Amino acid sequence: VPERPLLNKFAWMVGAFAVAGASIPTLGLSSSVSEAGINAQRLHEPPYNLIGRKIAIGAVDIGRPRKFGWDKSVQNHREIPVQGVFFQDTLPKPNAVEELPETMAQEHAEQVAAVMVSSDKTSRGVAPGAKLYAAGVGRLERNGQPEECVAAQHLAGQNGGDLRAINLSFGESLEQDPRPNARLDGNALLTQCLDWSARVHDVLYVVAGNQGSGGIPIPTDNYNGVNVAFSTLYEGMFRKVDLANVGTDFSGVLTRLVGKESNVNNRRLVSIVAPGSNLELLTLDGQRTVTSGTSFAAPHVTATVALLQEYGDRQLSQKTPQWTLDARRHQVMKAVLLNSADKIKDQGDGLRLGMGRDLLGAGNRNWLDSDAYKSPEIPLDGEMGSGHLDAFRAYQQFSAGQWSPAQAVPALGWDYREVSDKSYQDYVLEAPLQSGSFVAVTLTWNRLVELNDSNGNKQYDLGESFADRGLNDLNLYLMPAEENNTSKSISASTSQVDSTEHIFFPVPKTGRYKIRVQYAKSAFEGTQPYALAWWTVPSR
């Protein structure tokens, strides 16, 4: 393959390698995994004992982490255990060469891996028991999206085809996209590939959000994955969206960036926020480097999936009531992660769902200041998404189990189901809700992307393409239990362009309520699978 300097792709990484100045505190991985970060350490300890055992996750990057037993240069360092490494879809050459671009890519990939699976006692990763498969795509003279798709597909087939989440901590340039007048409209080849693979391989793709001066935003225009912005430490917690993130909203002279740095049609770009500023991370040389960026926020989310999936598999093996194989679905993971994210700190009375932090955006505004809180047509905040990742709250959300709308449902839970065109599913909450308490509800579903499979082998091959079949329009309502008219709902999320709907709203008065999932408009098929997660407060 012809090679070239990785100017565009390494712009993403070089920005992520900013070394903190003396006046800025640097933080070991233990801080971002602790209560000040995503609160995953609590899940590592009794009685939870969740470290991602037997759960396979993946990482696609420009480089790959070195693997003990494959690369001689890491014989003395085993703190970042990698289950399998690949170059695109083949075994890599052992003992990666030490030219500068390869070294940078290797270090970046190892630091991303460290966030997920590091076993170092002072810098333990989010899911040190998980099985990580990693693929590097290498240096390409042109747009590398086809090879990146091949690598992602190959990872999705590892572990017997059972990978629960795949991390992407790099971006592709719109300028190198071969489409004429390419824009962030969801139809770049890599973006379509991820949305196709999410459905076909049932894997959650976690994508590092756009940052810095932008310029490498593909595949943040995906529909079926999760895009991650990064937070910085503020008053002792990771609770402020870093100014280096590129969000969704552009106004004034910056409207020229719509479609280039943010999605067309005001579709939300950021799903969730995770720690990523001034982290001290490990490489397999035993070196610790201070890094910042969405590259290191995204793997916090990917590895949290491994913790949740270990719990889910434990429940399935014990045949626990309210647990089915739906617990493994990527849509369920997306709904659970987004619905349990921190927005505004609870005052100790539980009315704000036990949230542990006030997340702040530009100008110190919080989620209640956002257009997403005020407008039913905007499900997520442009900077903050649904809020800040909290692994323990995600566990609480997930551990409540799956509940069918066939009978009244508890205050906390999730479901995976289908809804027919022009129909709806009503989830009636069994207990009255407390006046003044917040309700959080998240609905997720997939855009349909199909493979133009010229040779009929059901796999993407170089030279093939994808077809966008569109996005069915689902809406979400919180309504009085006896009401049937959605115009009388107390809160709604009715975006016409997003594949996520989200409600976060205070209950106006104590009473019985229900959640409605409504199929508003069909783009392709008669039924639409979806995942739903809800968190409410029963009356006292």
Question: Predicted regions: what is each one?
Answer:
Residues 31-33, 42-147, 160-165, 175-177, ...:
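Subtilisin-like serine protease catalytic core
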